[in-house]
Regions:
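Alpha-helix-loop-beta-strand connector modules within alpha/beta enzyme cores
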Residues: 37-46, 65-91, 126-133, 182-192
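Glycine-rich, proline-tolerant flexible connector loops at the mouths of alpha/beta enzymes
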Residues: 23-32, 50-72
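Catalytic alpha/beta core domains of metabolic enzymes, predominantly
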Residues: 130-196
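Catalytic beta/alpha-barrel core
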Residues: 70-71, 85-100, 109-122, 133-144, ...
Length: 196
């Protein structure tokens, strides 16, 4: 399983579920450290492997005047400091090809491809070519079977550290519903992480 490949993961032999958690967006160092510290304490108490997640840039906002971040390098530096201070792996989502190498240069361990961008070949390949682990959020518009193509793009780029994140399918216009029947199908292609 991909979690075993992350050097800094604590409690990887606990046979417990693992947790990816953190602030939606990096808004400042103090908040990021406070969140990470609390989750690390809980993950140590309950022997839960933990990966810190924070978006350095929220590029997929509904409105043009919505908060998108504090600056790419500033936010990535905070993610790097959190990972180093707590000796934990980190993940962030990327939205442009250049973000893959940028995030990797700050030591991010796992590059996440957002659901709306999971079919963007150049972005997926750019993430894969960094050699970092790649998580592919299943688009709410995709069937489980179609995720094999996104996974194959990572594999064809010479990277076997890939997992799928299931986050649900569109149910009406604004709701998402997880169809658990698709998880075994996607497990044929890569490990599956449930985003709840």
């Amino acid at each position: 399983i991909m979690i075993q490949l992350l050097d800094k993961i604590h409690h990887k032999d606990s046979k417990n579920f693992f947790l990816i958690a953190g602030p939606c967006a990096i808004e400042g160092e103090e908040m990021a450290f406070e969140i990470a510290e609390k989750i690390v304490k809980l993950s140590d108490k309950y022997k839960i492997p933990y990966i810190f997640k924070g978006s350095f840039k929220k590029a997929n906002r509904s409105r043009v005047d919505s908060f998108t971040g504090i600056g790419d390098e500033k936010a990535l530096e905070i993610i790097k400091k959190v990972g180093e201070h707590f000796n934990i792996p980190t993940t962030t989502d990327i939205h442009e090809n250049a973000h893959a190498e940028l995030a990797a240069s700050y030591g991010v361990d796992v590059l996440q491809i957002p659901a709306f961008l999971v079919r963007q070949t150049d972005l997926v390949v750019a993430a894969a070519k960094t050699g970092k682990a790649v998580t592919l959020k299943k688009g709410q518009f995709l069937s489980p079977e179609s995720m094999k193509f996104a996974v194959q793009k990572v594999l064809d780029s010479g990277n076997d550290k890939v997992a799928i994140i299931e986050r649900g399918n569109s149910f009406g216009y604004t709701d998402l519903v997880v169809d658990f029947r698709g998880i075994p199908t996607m497990q044929n292609y890569a490990p599956v992480i449930l985003d709840v």
